[in-house]
């Protein structure tokens, strides 16, 4: 049998992208892993030395680390969960035919394409306890009598930043789910109508099963992105007040700003491992489904 000639052309096409990925992802990750095993404080460059697992031990003994990790879990669960619910509803609405649907679709993408830094600043002004628009609206609706310093109180700051990240992420869920909805054959719904299926039955028997993979990959991406998000929280509260909005990624960023790169790198590696525990089971499940 004649051997198939090795074709180098596809590898040449992929090589530039792989080189870029190696430069901007692989090398920094390896560097971060190396720093996590060192006492790497840029304020004391002469004291940089290998300390083995000392940074990791210190991290696990840090009460603020565990508080930030718990805040990260709440941040992801409520942030991504609400994004999915509202995004799913928006996708169902945009999948209907109505006048001006194209304009509504375009406008609905504005939160997603707006930079996170700008979103953080914009919502911080809206939440402002002195001249924020939310206080003005609530007063006109006679819901409050005195201004509420939303971002200065520990009991309101965290819900406020969650509302912001939900607003930002709804369009992404809506866009991805809408693409999945448009790929569902109309014959399935026609057959369901003939069988007398209700709207709820069609939703749970046809719609959701048909876009299950789309929902899962979209949710996975958002979990990773939201868990790693720094810009929105940092520009709104910087993790305060009293660390009430400090997620692990914000804690890492704040720690890196103190130039303690070894400690910050150790926390970053731990966060990456935590996210891997979410991503790997999904990938295994996906590969098993493809094999079946």
Protein language model regions, located:
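A structural signal for multi-pass alpha-helical bundles of membrane permease subunits
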Residues: 2-292
């Amino acid at each position: 049998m004649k051997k198939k000639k090795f074709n180098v052309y596809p590898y040449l096409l992929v090589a530039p992208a792989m080189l870029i990925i190696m430069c901007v992802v692989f090398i920094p990750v390896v560097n971060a892993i190396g720093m996590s095993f060192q006492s790497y404080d840029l304020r004391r460059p002469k004291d940089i030395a290998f300390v083995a697992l000392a940074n990791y031990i210190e991290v696990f003994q840090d009460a603020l680390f565990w508080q930030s990790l718990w805040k990260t879990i709440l941040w992801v669960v409520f942030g991504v969960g609400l994004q999915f619910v509202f995004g799913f509803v928006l996708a169902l609405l945009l999948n209907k035919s109505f006048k001006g649907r194209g304009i509504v679709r375009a406008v609905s993408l504005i939160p997603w394409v707006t930079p996170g830094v700008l979103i953080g600043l914009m919502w911080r002004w809206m939440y402002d306890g002195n001249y924020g628009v939310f206080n003005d609206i609530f007063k006109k609706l006679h819901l409050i009598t005195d201004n509420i310093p939303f971002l200065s109180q520990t009991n309101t700051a965290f819900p406020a930043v969650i509302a912001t990240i939900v607003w930002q992420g709804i369009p992404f869920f809506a866009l991805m789910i809408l693409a999945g909805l448009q790929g569902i054959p109309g014959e399935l719904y026609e057959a369901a109508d003939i069988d007398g299926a209700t709207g709820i039955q069609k939703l749970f028997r046809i719609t959701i099963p048909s876009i299950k993979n789309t929902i899962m990959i979209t949710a996975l991406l958002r979990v990773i992105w939201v868990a790693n998000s720094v810009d929105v929280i940092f520009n709104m509260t910087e993790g305060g007040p009293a660390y009430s909005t400090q997620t692990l990624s914000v804690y890492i960023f704040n720690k890196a700003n103190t130039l303690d790169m070894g400690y910050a790198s150790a926390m970053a590696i731990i966060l990456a491992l935590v996210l891997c525990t979410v991503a790997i089971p999904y990938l295994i499940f996906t590969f098993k489904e493809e094999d079946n």
